[in-house]
A protein has these predicted regions:
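Catalytic core of pol beta-like nucleotidyltransferases
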Residues: 1-25, 33-39, 48-142
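Short, well-ordered beta-strand segments
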Residues: 44-46
Length: 142
């Protein structure tokens, strides 16, 4: 699907999701939110609810909406998104629905705050992963 079509579809799906009064936030992220993308294979939407949606509820919503659109739809619960993914959504995703409007600001601030707290650990993980990769490339030491 063309990226522009996917973005338009995401807006339509956000409106449909917004018919549920529990839905407070809907973001499109991934390739469909990338202004440089020409094609997308799936549509990534992050959804925030009060109370948050169960895995079963999200799977049912994704199946229902995906069956009517013909594209694979991934729904990610914002409340349970890993720190790095939440940061990616906050920084590079597009908010399609925020109810109330300050819900978007609240999510972005929480996601960035959690990421900055986690960033030193993430950098250490990358250093350790790099050291392990270098050791594998060198092979066994005699």
């Amino acid at each position: 699907m063309k990226a522009a079509e996917a973005r338009a579809l995401a807006r339509t799906l956000a409106e449909e999701l917004g018919a549920n009064p529990r839905v407070q936030l809907v973001y499109v992220f991934g390739s469909a939110a990338d202004p440089d993308a020409a094609e997308v294979r799936d549509l990534d939407l992050a959804i925030g609810g009060a109370p948050s949606f169960s895995r079963e509820e999200l799977l049912a919503m994704a199946a229902r909406l995906g069956s009517t659109t013909g594209i694979t739809l991934d729904l990610v619960p914002l409340e349970r998104a890993p720190v790095v993914l939440a940061h990616e959504i906050a920084n590079h995703g597009t908010c399609l629905l925020a109810r109330p409007p300050e819900a978007e600001t609240s999510f972005v601030l929480r996601a960035r705050d959690a990421y900055w707290d986690f960033k030193p650990l993430l950098e250490q993980q990358w250093r350790l992963a790099g050291a392990r990769q270098e050791a594998r490339l060198r092979g066994p030491q005699a």
